[in-house]
Amino acid sequence: MKALVKTKKGKGFLEIKEMPVPEINYDEVLIKVHYTGICGTDVHIFTDQFPIYYPPVILGHEFSGEIVKLGEKVTSWKTGERVVGECQSLVCGKCRFCRTGHPEACAAKRSPGWGINGSFADYIKMPAWLLHKIPDSVSYREAALTEPAAVSSQALYSRAKVSTGDFVVVLGTGPIGIIIAKMAKIAGASQVLITGIDKDEKYRLLLAQKLGIENTVNVSKVNLKEMVDDLTDGIGADLVVEATGVEPAINQAFDIVRKLGKIAVIGVPGQSRLNVNWSAGSFKALDLCFSFSSQYEDWTRVLKLFENRALDLTDLVTHEFKLADWKMAFDKAIDCQGGKVLFKI
């Protein structure tokens, strides 16, 4: 099979290679990949900015596909069923995190795309227990967005616990930021603002508007704190979701959130140390939570939202490429002048 492989450590070293179709174990299934999305993680591995990965490895973890083969002890699935899969591969099942329903935090976890071979290929194998059925009304194309939507669900619903009536500001117009903003509206937020900078004005801020986020702000031209103060009678935002990972935006979150408010952090900085106005968090007595990965209930929630059309991400996908055109696809994902970039396998 054809696969896009990170062959060794360092910037670049990504190439199409002929790889064997995965051999499945008794508790696994083989999946024919239909669509698979480029995530920031894939970009960071490509540029050698992701802290952990084990080359040679097939990249990719956001996918939708069809079961074509079952392990001998798999009885809960049939060939031909359409599925998506969680990323908690190789978890131990015995540690405190696994036994309390948080396999995403297991130290033994090796996710597809960095720890084990991923979905930028014709086929991927997955443990049967990590699969979710795609509702009949949801296309393979849209289902490929389940993983980033589940990550967004974890940040907003499970970690930040957004409430009806909250004034929410989302910092960052990448796919995750836009999905979180849409989910905040679904949750009944009184207002949702999403912010970008000059480079986002001609595309991503407009894309957010197209996807139903009316209040878009270019913080390169608008004083965000003054704007939030005007809209909240000087109180500040109830919840700020930081989805950029850049230092100015992180500090902006501390400026615009209200006293006793919440900051949810999902953006991953490119550097390990930042200059953050920590005292503002202390004096405001803020709730600060970080979010990474997703849980079972996030996947079931997202698929139900897709099924009943409460969450429609059709327009978030702006570019599709064949795997052979991976260089163009990665260029488009890196230049931030698009929404979600998918490979159609």
Named regions from a protein language model:
Residues 3, 179, 222-223, 239, ...:
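C-terminal hydrophobic helical "lid"/dimerization subdomain
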Residues 22-36, 50-96, 135-137:
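Glycine-rich beta-strand-centered segment in the early N-terminal region that forms part
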Residues 91-171, 200:
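NAD(P)H dinucleotide-binding glycine-rich loop of Rossmann-like/cofactor-binding domains
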Residues 138-221, 226:
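Mid-domain Rossmann-like dinucleotide-binding core that forms the NAD(H)/NADP(H) cofactor-binding site
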Residues 203-209, 214, 247-308, 345:
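Glycine-rich phosphate-binding loop and adjacent beta-alpha segment
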Residues 231-239:
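A glycine-rich helix->loop->beta "capping" turn
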